[in-house]
């Protein structure tokens, strides 16, 4: 069954586990999966968990790209990136990138979240291909994947997703990471 929630979620036992199978099979395996996490979901038929994970990661990519774009603008306008993220976290724009990615991995200078650009590219491709198959317009997903591919071209498929921030630093001539 696919999982989502990052390394922090895995350590804390809070990852989302997406199970696609018959309902009676789900009821049998749920107690076993609850040992790993309290967040176990029956998503429908076989394969639905994979579709949901790919869709979730496409949404994560879109939010991450949008967040880096806006924080880059704010930094360019003279606002400290730490202040920008702190305020956004208490406002309607908060998301995984402002909660985890920026403070824990980019603003800290760590630059490691534990999820590669190649894995994100795989999931974004699955979700976008599914959109094509279902004749669903996904313009933000397509644009976000294009920006991800710019990062992959520069840093490779094994690069951490935190490197997407470097693409924005370079494009906007700003710095999100500490100077040290």
Which sequence ranges carry the predicted segments?
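ATP-dependent carboxylate/acyl-activation modules
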Residues: 34, 175-180
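Helical "substrate-binding/catalytic lid" subdomain
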Residues: 28, 48-171
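Rossmann-fold dinucleotide-binding core
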Residues: 1-61
């Amino acid at each position: 069954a696919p999982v989502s929630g990052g390394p922090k979620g895995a350590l804390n036992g809070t990852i989302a586990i997406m199970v696609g199978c018959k309902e009676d099979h789900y009821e049998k395996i749920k107690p076993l999966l609850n040992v790993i996490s309290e967040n176990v979901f029956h998503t429908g038929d076989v394969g639905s968990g994979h579709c949901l994970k790919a869709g979730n990661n496409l949404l994560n990519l879109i939010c991450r790209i949008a967040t880096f774009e806006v924080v880059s603008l704010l930094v360019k306008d003279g606002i400290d990136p730490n202040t920008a993220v702190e305020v956004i976290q208490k406002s309607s724009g908060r998301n995984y990138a402002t909660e985890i990615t920026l403070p824990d991995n980019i603003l800290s200078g760590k630059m490691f979240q534990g999820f590669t650009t190649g894995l994100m590219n795989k999931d974004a491709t699955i979700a976008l291909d599914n959109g094509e198959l279902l004749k669903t317009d996904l313009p933000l997903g397509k644009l976000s994947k294009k920006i991800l591919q710019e990062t992959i071209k520069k840093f490779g498929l094994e690069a951490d997703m935190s490197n997407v921030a470097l693409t924005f630093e370079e494009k906007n001539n700003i710095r999100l990471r500490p100077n040290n």
